[in-house]
Amino acid sequence: MLRRALEEAIAQALKEMGVPARLKVARAPKDKPGDYGVPLFALAKELRKPPQAIAQELKDRLPLPEFVEEAIPVGGYLNFRLRTEALLREALRPKAPFPRRPGVVLVEHTSVNPNKELHVGHLRNIALGDAIARILAYAGREVLVLNYIDDTGRQAAETLFALRHYGLTWDGKEKYDHFAGRAYVRLHQDPEYERLQPAIEEVLHALERGELREEVNRILLAQMATMHALNARYDLLVWESDIVRAGLLQKALALLEQSPHVFRPREGKYAGALVMDASPVIPGLEDPFFVLLRSNGTATYYAKDIAFQFWKMGILEGLRFRPYENPYYPGLRTSAPEGEAYTPKAEETINVIDVRQSHPQALVRAALALAGYPALAEKAHHLAYETVLLEGRQMSGRKGLAVSVDEVLEEATRRARAIVEEKNPDHPDKEEAARMVALGAIRFSMVKTEPKKQIDFRYQEALSFEGDTGPYVQYAHARAHSILRKAGEWGAPDLSQATPYERALALDLLDFEEAVLEAAEEKTPHVLAQYLLDLAASWNAYYNARENGQPATPVLTAPEGLRELRLSLVQSLQRTLATGLDLLGIPAPEVM
């Protein structure tokens, strides 16, 4: 990467100036000279010089890498203009994943209660989690994707109770998770709901004993059909009943009790409970005490989350895994009493959970620190995200007001089919094209926005072939692929024939790896999504460029040498868009 090589050269020159600093090189503004630039304002205080003087001194001291044509002081910046041929060679270099580095990153996402169909709110969780896992893997990390199955939770118990209580029989036509979800909603609308609590508790206790697992699994398999349709990937399923059976909770509490900040008060409102004082790690709390174990001996969900986190990071062991029989994911493994012992010992974890769970996630990190693992606490990340509206409406599964992911997929595909029919009535496979466009529209809309901002999914906007949408990027890819298909084979490009149009497009292509690394470091895919939108816009501007009323950048009819250069750039662009879309879990259609 040219940027990284330039950063190394700058760091060496600054070291010789007595400043051991590593500055980030970024794209120079389009109205300023140069391609890249580095700001020097942060060094003014240490060097006791104005930034303009530092820029000039750095220029004088810096041996320019061979790919840099000149260094240009611009105010408090030092900008760099790259040699055109070096820029083009780098842009045409085939893209490849970054070298593998040691250490496992464990990404937990989806983790939907196994009691009903997935709804729109789950879409964002799956799209974010799956995309960040793909991005991290491309960036050189060993990634494990985990889906947590809360089979001992109240929601699962209520659904299984409702199916029996109302004597419901599945007819095989409706998806089973939808069938189960209707029973769950019926129970919550039942005027006898409160009277039924003791019977629901009996089902809950049966689940805690590891019973009724096959009934839960039946719902889970139906949910997994939806996850597979969304193109999500998983490596491990972890069932809460297996965590209970392995005694991870007791082991975690025993470990925490060794800390002076975890204790059992003898009096007051917490008398008899096991309490954690989080104030040494989270200052400023109005009430810093959090119950891990109630006075009646039952665990809070804080305690369960902490125990699970301890297992993820290798502090505790005890879970076993075996292959999971399912028609969607051949290599998937599930926790099970009869499996083989396995602990991921993750160096870093990312829990994709909505922003309303920020406080419990902070307590998980606090528990790691108080248990004597402050370094691991720093590596336990919460990818928090805001809620999703559908056409301006808020969802509520318990009230039966949620729209299922299956319905969204079906409706988006129906609308996409009509668009494909209108734009390309001779398309060889309209159904597959519609599926790909619908998936691109849905998944892109879930990741293009910064996670902590609420989004409102609207079909017409998301499916548009124009604007900041997945289909817009997919269409840019298909247009590039069409040119390559018509071109057939071509020879070596003549880099010396490049015009400013090729130079500008090549410079944008160089930003791909930087976008991937930034998305991986910031742990949010919206950075990559925005890059793909910008690259698609650059490609469309290149494709449609005109001078004196004539096309300025014809590809197939360009002179020899320039034609090969333009085809090579189009190929690099097509591959970059395809790779970027894949990292977001989105297919790249060849024809639209």
Curated annotation (Swiss-Prot):
Q: Which Pfam families match?
A: Arg_tRNA_synt_N (PF03485), DALR_1 (PF05746), tRNA-synt_1d (PF00750)
- Which PROSITE patterns does the entry link to? AA_TRNA_LIGASE_I
Could you name the domain of life of the organism this protein comes from? Answer: Bacteria
User: What Gene Ontology cellular component terms go with this record?
Assistant: cytoplasm
Q: List the Gene3D superfamilies.
A: Arginyl tRNA synthetase N-terminal domain, HUPs, Isoleucyl-tRNA Synthetase, Domain 1
Keywords carried by this UniProt record = Aminoacyl-tRNA synthetase, ATP-binding, Cytoplasm, Ligase, Nucleotide-binding, Protein biosynthesis
Coiled coil located at which positions?
none
Q: What is its EC number?
A: 6.1.1.19
Q: What is this protein called?
A: Arginine--tRNA ligase
Q: Which organism is it from?
A: Thermus thermophilus (strain ATCC BAA-163 / DSM 7039 / HB27)
Read off the lineage from the record. Answer: Bacteria, Thermotogati, Deinococcota, Deinococci, Thermales
The UniProt gene name for this protein comes to: argS
